[in-house]
Every structure is written in structure tokens, then in C-alpha cells.
């Protein structure tokens, strides 16, 4: 079958940037323009079809996580260094105002620094003071456990934070080096999407799809950086760092993390970026705004990990001590209350930061954040009270239960095929850490519809809470009367029920995408391409350009096909005659056959690829309905529909 005419007419690199394909065999279109040259048409293209980024690599799917580094922040920073031309403002009024850092975002970061000693384990003053009290009272066992949880959470978070810094620093250096190479006279800067390094070397073959996606993002960063070197701030960031400057940065960051101040540094950096965003002009406001959003998402992820590595075990320990001693000290109560609030707030604030950092997700309102906080507060309270009651009687069996539950949850998370990190080993470490979170609360690690997984998780939690509470009541100490035992059991089950009610309220009334109940999987969310429309001016000029460049484009495609020595990746053929089935009849459409395996890419990259292809084809062909995508492994149709319903 003859290769169809290309979809690109003015700048063939559009599909490369739009699809963000990390395939080593994909040679879509090289650059035919001088690197750095930007015309009104290319600027309109960038604004009408923003380059899909990997969003937050350390997030639930994005970002988001250990070894994957943060989202490629320079991608938006480089592109936004140019002010929006008036012609584009007239076509798309939504781009007329570049967002600034809101005062609420800056206040949230400031509150994180202000309440850092009480909520973050770097160092948590109440826990350290309590450990000192245990040591002075001769309770060496309680002193050791309290101090161990403090050190465990602090060191783990500093290691994660420094690992992210290393990845960010190396990625930025790689991108700036590539951009500076392309800016040299006579340099061959043809962009070919491959799985090589950021410089485009096709010989390097990463071992994991995550690494392919990361390198592809680096290539896009280098390409966008080379196109925005006219701005002063971007030009400064694009210069290759000297050896002395790099050494100073490494030394400073090493000292900060050795002193256990990695989170404080990131919070202060977030506030600084927010202030710069509000004070900067229109040309660089977008750049600082998105850098602030991504930095706050990173520090929220660190807060989440630190909280569940330190505050959650600390809370169970203090409640167990209170039950065993039948006494409550003021410092114990304050530490337990602060830990419980920190656990619930960590989950709610992370969801807020995650949605703010992803332009494909609707932002979550502050009322929804409060509802989420209440949901996690009551469910975690029921969980830790149950643990404390059971551990006060069965210390050994409680440890066995925790290890067994953690192993089961970790295997479940691994089975979900999370894709937060670069390497497989880092992914396993991250899944093990998330398994600790699953001991206490629900944490979504997979894109798509989570109704079934959410129901299974809370059903298991309810069974465990019931079994542990019943065993404690049957084998409790004789001095514990029913006047204490029965109210304790009532608190456990009423708190769990209250948390479930708040969860249902969130999904029924406060979810950003609207009510999530009563929707069938097939129509839960329409494809975003159906709502995509182009301005009449752009659509008319696009059709005219396509009709005028048919012959030239076909010759160029034939040349590229002969050079590559492989079959075309994208083929368009008419829809096959429909076969009798239970599905309702579909509108007549074209099927795009993609000669690639979809499952070889990370989940978010697959979703970006689908969405970008539809938008590009729908925009340039002006089809009344979006085309359907068919992969080689299209037997798993439900998986594709699952990601399509997340927009």
C-alpha cells in the first residue's frame, strides 16, 4: 500500500513533537527549518497543539517518582520564553493571559515551611522530645523505636530528594549540551525520534521503556531550547555550565541533604519561583509558574513519603504505649494528633499538587481537598487505633501481620505495572515504599478507572480491622473493662464508616471530572478529540496547504522510506466491513494502523501518543469524528479505553 501524504505541511517536525514517540524505529519527519527559527505559523502550531510532556514522572500516574526525575520543566520554560503574538491572541483568547503563581499556591508553600518542624521529619521536634523523655525515664526500648522511625523517615526522604536532584541536573546538562551543539553553524540538527541518547544517537538502546520515554523527552527539550535562545533568561540557562559552577552546585546540594534540609530547601525554592512568577514580565512568567508548580509537586511527594515512613509508625507506636500504660501524657497526645493530621493532609495536598502540575487534568478545588482530608483522616484513624489495640496484646503477631500485609500490597502494586522510575530496580524500590502507604491508607498508583481496586482495598481493610479488633476484645488484659473496650470498638467502626461516607461524597459531588458513579465504562468520558475544534482561519489555510503540497510531500515520503529501509510506521486504510456484534453501530471512520507495539511504552506515553495522533489527524483532515487507533496488540481494547477516560 502506498504511503499516504504526510499530515505536516509547514513544519514537518510537528508530528515528532506532538506524538512524542520514543520508538527506535520511528523516523517520522526531520527538521527542514533553521534551528531556532520561529514564524507566526510555528508559534500558532505550538500554542494550538502544545507539546505533550510526560507530566509528573513522580506522580501517580506521573510522577511521578524515585529515579524518573521530575517532569521536564524546561520544555514549557523554553517555549514560553517568547511572548504570545497578537494574531494568536485573537484566534485563541485563552492564551492571551499567561498564568501567574496564585497567592494561594505561594501561601501553601509558605505554610509548608512554617509548619515544617511540626509536620515534617527533618527533624520533628515532638518526636525527638518524646524520645528524650523515654530515655530519661529508662524506657530504652520505646526510646529506640521512636528514634528509629525519626531517622528512617529523614534519611529515606533525603536519599530520594538527592536522587531527584541528580537526575534533574544531569537531564538539564544533557539538554543544554544538545541545544548548544545544534546552534553551531553547519551542525546537522535533524530531529529523528529514537531511543538513543538525548543527542540522538541511535546506537544506544535503553533497557526499559521508561528510559526510552525519558530520553525522548530530553530530545524534545533540546529542540525547544534551541528555538528560544533569543530570550535572556533562557539563553543564560541554555549555556553549558562550567566545571567550577557544577562543582559548587553539587557541593551545596550535598551539604543541604547531609544536614537533612532537602525538603526545606525545596519549599524555599518553591516560594522563590512563585515570587518570581508574580514579579516577572509576560515573557518569562509562564516559565517560572510551571517550574513552581512542578517543584511543589516534587516536595509534596517527598512530604507524602516522609509522612508514611515516620509519622504513621510513630502514631501506631504512641497509641500502643498509651493503651499499655493506661496513661496519656500531653506530649504523647500532641505527637499522635500531629502525626494523624499529617498523614491525612499529606495525601490530600499531594493530590492537589499533582493535578495542578498536569495540564491534562482538571484542578481540584479546595473544598474537594477538605473532603479528601476528612476521608483519609477518619479511615487512617480507624486503622491506627485498630493497630494500637491489637499490638498492645499481640506484639509478635502484629509484626507478622504488618510484614504479610506489606508483602501482599507490594505484589499487588507490582502487578499493576506502575511506571514511575527509570530502571526496573528503582521501580521495585518505589513499589516497596508505596506498599508501606497501603498498610494505612489508599493511594492510587495507576491511571484509569479505580472503582474496582478501591472497593477491593477497602473491603480487605474492613475485614482486617474487624478481625484485629475482635481478637483484641477476646484476649484483652483483665484490667481493661468493657467500659473502655466497647467505646474503643465503636470509635474504630464509626470512624471507618465516616471516612467511607466522605469518600463517597468526594466521588459523587466534588470530583473534578464530575460525579463518578452511575457511569458505564463505555461512556464514562468522551474522547477529547471530539471536542477539539480549529479556528476557521487555521482550518482554511491548512486545507489549502495540504492540497498544494500533495506531490512534494509524497516524493519526500518515498525518499524517507527508501532511506529508512523499513515499512512505513503509519498507514491509513478504510474501515473493514462491520461484523455482527453486540456493540452499537459506529460512525463511518478511518482506521490508522500503527506498526508499533503499544505496550512497550509507559502508560502515560501511550496515552499521550493516542491523544496527540487524534488531535493532529482531526485538525489537518477536518474529519467530523475522531479516527480510531489500531495497534498490533489491539486485543486489549479495554486497556486503551481505560486511559481514554482519564482526561
Curated annotation (Swiss-Prot):
Q: Which UniProt keywords apply?
A: Apoptosis, Cell membrane, Membrane, Phosphoprotein, Transmembrane, Transmembrane helix
A GO cellular-component term linked to this record: plasma membrane
Annotated positions of the Phosphoserine modification = 197
Question: Known activity regulation?
Answer: Phospholipid scramblase activity is activated upon caspase cleavage to generate the XK-related protein 4, processed form. Does not act prior the onset of apoptosis.
Q: Where is this region: Disordered?
A: 193-238
- Where found, per UniProt? Cell membrane
| Composition skew (Polar residues), residue ranges | 207-236
Which source organism? Answer: Rattus norvegicus
Give the membrane topology. Answer: Multi-pass membrane protein
According to UniProt, where does the site described as Cleavage lie?
A: 564-565
Q: Which cysteines are joined by disulfide bonds?
A: none
Q: Which Pfam families match?
A: XK-related
Question: What is this protein's name?
Answer: XK-related protein 4
Amino acid at each position: 500500500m502506498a504511503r499516504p501524504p504526510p499530515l505536516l505541511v509547514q513544519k514537518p517536525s510537528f508530528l515528532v513533537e506532538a506524538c512524542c514517540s520514543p520508538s527506535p524505529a520511528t523516523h517520522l519527519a526531520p527538521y527542514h527549518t533553521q534551528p531556532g527559527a520561529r514564524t507566526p505559523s510555528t508559534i500558532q502550531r505550538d500554542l494550538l497543539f502544545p507539546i505533550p510532556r510526560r507530566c509528573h514522572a513522580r506522580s501517580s500516574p506521573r510522577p511521578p517518582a524515585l529515579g524518573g526525575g521530575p517532569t521536564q520543566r524546561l520544555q514549557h520554560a523554553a517555549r514560553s520564553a517568547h511572548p504570545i503574538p497578537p494574531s494568536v491572541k485573537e484566534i485563541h483568547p485563552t492564551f492571551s493571559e499567561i498564568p501567574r503563581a496564585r497567592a494561594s499556591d505561594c501561601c501553601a508553600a509558605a505554610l509548608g515551611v512554617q509548619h515544617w518542624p511540626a509536620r515534617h521529619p527533618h527533624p520533628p521536634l515532638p518526636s525527638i522530645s518524646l524520645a528524650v523523655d523515654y530515655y530519661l525515664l529508662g524506657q530504652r526500648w520505646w526510646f529506640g523505636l521512636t528514634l528509629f522511625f525519626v531517622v528512617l523517615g529523614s534519611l529515606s526522604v533525603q536519599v530520594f530528594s538527592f536522587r531527584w536532584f541528580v537526575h534533574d541536573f544531569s537531564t538539564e546538562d544533557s539538554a543544554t549540551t544538545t541545544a548548544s551543539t545544534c546552534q553551531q553553524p553547519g551542525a546537522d540538527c535533524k530531529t529523528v525520534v529514537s531511543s538513543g541518547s538525548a543527542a540522538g544517537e541511535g546506537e544506544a538502546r535503553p533497557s526499559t521503556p521508561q528510559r526510552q520515554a525519558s530520553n525522548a523527552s530530553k530530545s524534545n527539550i533540546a529542540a525547544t531550547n534551541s528555538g528560544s535562545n533569543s530570550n535572556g533568561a533562557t539563553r543564560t540557562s541554555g549555556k553549558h555550565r562550567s566545571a567550577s559552577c557544577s562543582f559548587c552546585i553539587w557541593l551545596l546540594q550535598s551539604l543541604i541533604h547531609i544536614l537533612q534540609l532537602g525538603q526545606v530547601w525545596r519549599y524555599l525554592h518553591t516560594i522563590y519561583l512563585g515570587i518570581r512568577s508574580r514579579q516577572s514580565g509576560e515573557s518569562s512568567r509562564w516559565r517560572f509558574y510551571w517550574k513552581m508548580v512542578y517543584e511543589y509537586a516534587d516536595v509534596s511527594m517527598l512530604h507524602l513519603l516522609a509522612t508514611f515512613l515516620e509519622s504513621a509508625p510513630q502514631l501506631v507506636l504512641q497509641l500502643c504505649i498509651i493503651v499499655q500504660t493506661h496513661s496519656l501524657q500531653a506530649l504523647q497526645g500532641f505527637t499522635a494528633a500531629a502525626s494523624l493530621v499529617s498523614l491525612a493532609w499529606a495525601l490530600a495536598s499531594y493530590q492537589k499538587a499533582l493535578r495542578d502540575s498536569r495540564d491534562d487534568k482538571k484542578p481540584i478545588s479546595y473544598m474537594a481537598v477538605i473532603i479528601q482530608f476528612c476521608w483519609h483522616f477518619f479511615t487512617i484513624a480507624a486503622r491506627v487505633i485498630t493497630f494500637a489495640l491489637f499490638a498492645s496484646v499481640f506484639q509478635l503477631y502484629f509484626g507478622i501481620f504488618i510484614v504479610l500485609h506489606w508483602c501482599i500490597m507490594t505484589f499487588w502494586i507490582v502487578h499493576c505495572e506502575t511506571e514511575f522510575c527509570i530502571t526496573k530496580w528503582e521501580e521495585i524500590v518505589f513499589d516497596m515504599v508505596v506498599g508501606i502507604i497501603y498498610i494505612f491508607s489508599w493511594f492510587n498508583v495507576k491511571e484509569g478507572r479505580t472503582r474496582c481496586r478501591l472497593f477491593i482495598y477497602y473491603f480487605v481493610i474492613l475485614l482486617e480491622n474487624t478481625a484485629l479488633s475482635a481478637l483484641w476484645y477476646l484476649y484483652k488484659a483483665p484490667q481493661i473493662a468493657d467500659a473502655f473496650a466497647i467505646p474503643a470498638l465503636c470509635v474504630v467502626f464509626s470512624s471507618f464508616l465516616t471516612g467511607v461516607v466522605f469518600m463517597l461524597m468526594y466521588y459523587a459531588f466534588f470530583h473534578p471530572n464530575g460525579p463518578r458513579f452511575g457511569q458505564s465504562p463505555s461512556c464514562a468520558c468522551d474522547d477529547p478529540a471530539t471536542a477539539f475544534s480549529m479556528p476557521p482561519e487555521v482550518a482554511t489555510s491548512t486545507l489549502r496547504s495540504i492540497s498544494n503540497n500533495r506531490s512534494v510531500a509524497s516524493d519526500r515520503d518515498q525518499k524517507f522510506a527508501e532511506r529508512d529501509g523499513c515499512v512505513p510506521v503509519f498507514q491509513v486504510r478504510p474501515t473493514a466491513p462491520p461484523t455482527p456484534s453486540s456493540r452499537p453501530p459506529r460512525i463511518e471512520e478511518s482506521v490508522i494502523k500503527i506498526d508499533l507495539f503499544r505496550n512497550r511504552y509507559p502508560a502515560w506515553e501511550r496515552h499521550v501518543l493516542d491523544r496527540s495522533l487524534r488531535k493532529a489527524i482531526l485538525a489537518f483532515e477536518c474529519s467530523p469524528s475522531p479516527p480510531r487507533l489500531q495497534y498490533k496488540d489491539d486485543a486489549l481494547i479495554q486497556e486503551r479505553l481505560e486511559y481514554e477516560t482519564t482526561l
